[in-house]
Amino acid sequence: MKNYNSHKYEYGLLKSTKPSMGYDGSIPLDEWKSQAKSKLTELLGLPFDECESKAEIEYSKECDGYTEHRFSVQTEPGYYVPCHLRIPSGVCKPIPLTLCLSGHGGGMHIALGVAKNEKDEASLSAWHHRAMAPRSNKEGRAALVIEARNFGEASLTGYGTSCTEAAKIAILMGRTVIGERVWDAMRITVRPIRIAIFAASVQLVP
């Protein structure tokens, strides 16, 4: 019987494909890690052109148990990422930091533990771990929350997600949306000592 289902065909190709970068022990692990990192960087479409950060603080405010700084930083020429830095009160400095990356949902406000509507309230109620910043502060860590591309304030409407459109455009330019998000979250000049990363992605189905 002829197969007219293209998805079934592609799935068959996927199952029969042998990963080209699979580790088989024939070379030292560190050498394989270097090769894998180089290939992953290539597939993500990285690196992009570096630029001035032009960081600008929009506001700073004292809250119950922490100080919050809202700021933006330029990650590509003409593109700025909105961020929130929460520093817990009453801790000895310097302190460790958690980079909080929220996934599919309303936006980075979820990682801050802030609900903008009933859908957000349901999400935070069902998935407590998505409120990453409050947990980090409770553990004595600073929390840096950034808005991922095509999510929240960076989406078409300023709330929710708009990944599909952006992903198609990125592919046409030899880029990837995931590569763009990685680029926004990394800084080559920063040493990752005492910096943790926490990411959560879930789509709440009503």
Task: State where each predicted segment sits.
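Alpha/beta-hydrolase fold nucleophile elbow
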Residues: P192-P206
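Proline/glycine-enriched tight loop/beta-turn segments at coil->beta junctions
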Residues: G78-V81, P88-T98, H104-G107
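Cap/lid segment of the alpha/beta-hydrolase catalytic domain
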Residues: K93, L101-I193
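Alpha-helical packing segments of well-folded alpha/beta enzyme cores
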Residues: W32-A36, L40, Y79, M132, ...
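N-terminal targeting or regulatory segments adjacent to alpha/beta-hydrolase or S9 domains
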Residues: M1-T67
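Short, glycine/acidic-rich beta->alpha junctions
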Residues: G65, G78, L124-H128, D184, ...
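Generic beta-strand/beta-sheet core signal
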Residues: R86, I146, L204-P206
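Short beta-strand segments that buttress and anchor functional surface loops
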Residues: H69-E76
